[in-house]
Amino acid sequence: MGWSCIMLFLAATATGVHFQVQLQQPGAELVKPGASVKLSSKASGYTFTSYWMHWVKQRPGRGLEWIGRIDPNSGGTKYNEKFKSKATLTVDKPSSTAYMQLSSLTSEDSAVYYCAR
C-alpha cells in the first residue's frame, strides 16, 4: 500500500488599512496522514498583545470556517466546537508569533489556513 500526503496552504490577513501591519506565515506544508503540524503566524507593525489572533480554514470550493482565537496577552483561547480536538492555539509573546497545531491529520484537513488579527 502506498502512502499519501496532505497539503496545507498558509495565508494571513490583517484588519484595517494600516499598511505596516503584517502577519507572516511560511509557505505550504506537506505532511502524512495521521501526523501533526504546527503552523505559525509572526506579527509585526502593531502591539501583538493588544489584539486577538484568529485562525480560519478554507477548503477548495467551500466557505470559511472559524477555528478559534487566542488572546496573546493572557493565552486564553476560544474554539469552534468542531475543532476542539483538532487544533491547539498557542503564542510566543517575545517573538510576537501565534501558533496553531493540528493533530491526527486526514484528507479533510487539506485546506488553506488563515491567521487573522
Swiss-Prot record:
Cellular component aspect of the GO annotation:
extracellular region; immunoglobulin complex
Signal as a keyword of this entry, yes or no, is yes
Q: Where is this region: Complementarity-determining-1?
A: 50-54
GO biological process, alphabetically ordered: adaptive immune response
Q: Output the CDD domains linked to this UniProt entry.
A: IgV_H
- Signal sequence residues: 1-19
The segments labelled Framework-1 in the record are: 20-49
Keyword list (alphabetical) reads: Adaptive immunity, Immunity, Immunoglobulin, Signal
* SUPFAM superfamilies per UniProt: Immunoglobulin
Extract the ranges annotated as region (Framework-2).
55-68
User: What's the protein name?
Assistant: Ig heavy chain V region 1-62-3
Source species: Mus musculus
